[in-house]
From Swiss-Prot:
Keywords: RNA-binding, Transcription, Transcription antitermination, Transcription regulation. NCBIfam families: nusB, PRK00202.1-1. The keyword DNA repair does not apply. GO terms for molecular function: RNA binding. The lineage of its organism: Bacteria, Bacillati, Bacillota, Bacilli, Lactobacillales. This is Transcription antitermination protein NusB. GO terms for biological process: DNA-templated transcription termination; transcription antitermination. It comes from Pediococcus pentosaceus (strain ATCC 25745 / CCUG 21536 / LMG 10740 / 183-1w). Belongs to the NusB family. The gene is nusB. Gene3D superfamilies: NusB-like. It holds the Pfam family NusB.
Amino acid sequence: MSLNRHQIRESAFKIIFAKSANPDADLSELQDQVLEEFHETEAPDQFLKDLVMGVSLNLEAINETISGELKKGWTVKRLESPDRVILQMGTYEIKYTETPDKVAINEALELAKKYTDEDARKFINGVLSNIAK
């Protein structure tokens, strides 16, 4: 059984989150661990690989884009880890993929519903909406 796009995004979130907590971790091992949670035995979907690698390879530019939307004195590193990863993924999809902006923002908000609180969801929505303009 292959994962749907939302499950793939959630898997990517978990992989990127784990990698941000442990920069020395092996991406392939993280990917295997996350996919085991879904009892997924098939090879990872290309979309998952593209999302994880796209965020990783463009992280500096993504963080600069996010920083431009933060209040003066705030940095991306100051954000809570789940919020930061969701913003990084949403920004990547808005800026670097063909995903419609509304879909990228909605998917980010779905992740935020599960992994953050109401204030963080509003914050993520505002930042990504500004980035999409």
